[in-house]
Amino acid sequence: MKGLVLSFALVALSALCVYGDVPIQPDFQEDKILGKWYGIGLASNSNWFQSKKQQLKMCTTVITPTADGNLDVVATFPKLDRCEKKSMTYIKTEQPGRFLSKSPRYGSDHVIRVVESNYDEYTLMHTIKTKGNEVNTIVSLFGRRKTLSPELLDKFQQFAKEQGLTDDNILILPQTDSCMSEV
């Protein structure tokens, strides 16, 4: 039993060391991240992503400030024959560009980092999602337009691989017109 507890402690410590090295946008400017974004790329090692990735398509995400100084993040995406919305609140931390979020519906905790953004073209984000003993990495690429340059797509894929994700974990989301005007 002691060995099992020690193993879990070492795994948690290793994860902390690895994820502590994820960069955050220098001089993060929250007011410039606000507004509408298109979900261009998604990468994850979660079982959910692997089982659903063939069905995933581009989505829209709108980021707005809350009255208490945090961020509301609402993603609208096509699901079967309808548009579905998923809302999260990104809670600010002491480090600009790093946020926390909880999903009571799914019982998961999220640590979100804005890795890199030029604010008017693209944003690269890194999320660690924890649910029970399961820890997953999510890398997301957003654009102000539905298409981004091949160089930015490569940057996203390279960053995802640097986080331990494989080609099979990485998806450039297929473009769609479904749900794009629902925002």
UniProtKB/Swiss-Prot annotation:
SUPFAM superfamilies: Lipocalins. The keyword Disulfide bond applies. The keyword DNA repair does not apply. Keywords: Disulfide bond, Secreted, Signal. Disulfide bonds join C83-C179. It is found in: Secreted. It comes from the Eukaryota. PANTHER family: CHLOROPLASTIC LIPOCALIN (PTHR11430:SF32), LIPOCALIN (PTHR11430). Belongs to the calycin superfamily. Lipocalin family. This is Lipocalin. It comes from Rhinella marina.
